[in-house]
Amino acid sequence: MNSNKAMMARRSDAVPRGVGQIHPIFAERAENCRVWDVEGREYLDFAGGIAVLNTGHLHPQVVAAVEDQLKKLSHTCFQVLAYEPYLALCEKMNQKVPGD
């Protein structure tokens, strides 16, 4: 079993000093608004990380959409190689936001 203390030691040896870390805790898994560390302790996720603030961790609709997309294309930079879902999202956002 990993411990937060042991992982902090590994981090100290492996991660550049310029990469900050607020809490000496390492996440093992998350669901909805809860996160469990590598020692099994449960926390409420008050950090609201990218892609989970509105839906929580592992929202079933988000998981399904990601799985569907990964079967087609995992990632590309739209400015280099464009793809249709990006256009569809922009069109949808433009319909909801006022202005020209």
Regions found by a protein language model. Give the residues of each.
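Active-site-adjacent loop/helix segments that line or gate small-molecule/cofactor pockets in enzymes
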Residues: 1-31, 86
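Short amphipathic alpha-helical segments
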Residues: 5, 9, 33, 41-44, ...
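Hydrophobic alpha-helical segments with strong N-terminal bias
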Residues: 21, 38-40, 69
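Active-site and channel-lining beta-strand-loop segments
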Residues: 25-47
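Glycine-rich loop-to-alpha-helix module at the N-terminal edge of alpha/beta enzyme cores
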Residues: 42-100
